[in-house]
Amino acid sequence: MNRYLVTLGVGLPVLLAAAPAAPWRDTPVARLEALALIQTLNGEILASPSATLTLERWCRRHALAEPAQLIARQIEANPAEAGAAVRQHLQVSAAEPLRSRRVELRCGEHLLAIADNWYVPSRLTPAMNRLLETTQRPFGKVVQALSPQRQTLAATLLWSPLPEGWERAARGAPAKAAGAGTLSVPAALFAHQAIVFSARHQPIAEVHEVYQRDILAFPEPGLSAPQP
């Protein structure tokens, strides 16, 4: 499986996923559908208090795995230390202990996101800290009893299926023929940076997430799928 690195947020290297399991044909309609799906998930995460639960719903809706259950697979034993900006966002001093996780958020075989997470252990229960240290449960599920809410600091579209200037293309220009090739989808589709707050509006974590192309790892929607 081929992988490569990019940099996100505070300069951390992020491991990106290999090719998706279900490539789409490269047609104008398929590109529009891909953009619509990317922006749908992007908007759902922005509007949701939990990226974890949103990804699980997405996995279930598009039958990516059975059961549609998200796991957080650790990919680095010693994630980077939190910088001054993270501590400022979390409203903690330089002396306050922070812990971090760098994980792959997977649903079945599909890598849906890479997440870097810095959290304040003193603001979680001992049981929550133990689960974060010893299990593959996603952060959002572990802290669910705190009724967490997200405040987005940044949301970035990393790839658009529509080429720049597509709206200025000459009318009547020939479109790519159906079945002319496979849609080439890069590993990273969009990224979020957010603060997670408890119900008391106390910051408990900062997360940097890069959402991966396996969010589209299902057959083309009916509008663009080949007809029998």
Segments predicted by a language model, with ranges:
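Bacterial N-terminal signal peptides
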Residues: T7-L15
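Positively charged n-region of N-terminal signal peptides that target proteins for export
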Residues: M1-Y4
